[in-house]
Amino acid sequence: MNSMSILNPVYRRDNLAPFYVLDDIFSSEELDRITAYCQQAGTEKAQVVQSRGMIVTDDKLRLSDIMMHRANRENKWIFDRVLEAFEMANRDAYNFELDGFNQFQYSVYNHQGAHYEYHMDVSFASVSDRFLIGRKLSLSIMLNDESEFTGGEFQMIIDSQTIEKPITVPHKRGRFVFFPAFMVHRVAPVKSGTRKSLVFWALGPKFR
């Protein structure tokens, strides 16, 4: 593994760790390689899960393009590296009971106004898909440099005090941002340029 650095390893507020940050897991060359791999596969319009479990397109809630990637021989090195980081984050900050993960999402916010409104990654809708209801620890990885876009901030609401002024995690290429899947978060509207990221979800038994 490349040398690791930690920025604010655990952001704590009222004994809660809403996010955990790691830097330098992937080199710049590796990030280029990941981006090229994802771009080659293409993208499709992102959708959302409604309260009744229906999966629909809703530009007011989510306007971006995505593609899901399952683990295979070609991308195994990505999963191996991310697994090590998940283990560190979970050990240091959360101690969740996790079963692992087998896919990731490539996300592209490629025009003005592209966004993903406030949401949780774990679904409480009436669905049987364990990939939606079993999410416990989320990870967002910034693929491109912050100079390539404006807006698109990754923001979180953790209590009543942060509703009006959400916590904004600073952009940095390659930054890993871990957070519990029940944390309310969003990608603010992109003002210019293109924002690219990977998203992983580690699954496990339901929160008790």
Task: Please identify what each model-predicted range represents.
Residues 1-176, 182-208:
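Fe(II)/2-oxoglutarate oxygenase catalytic core
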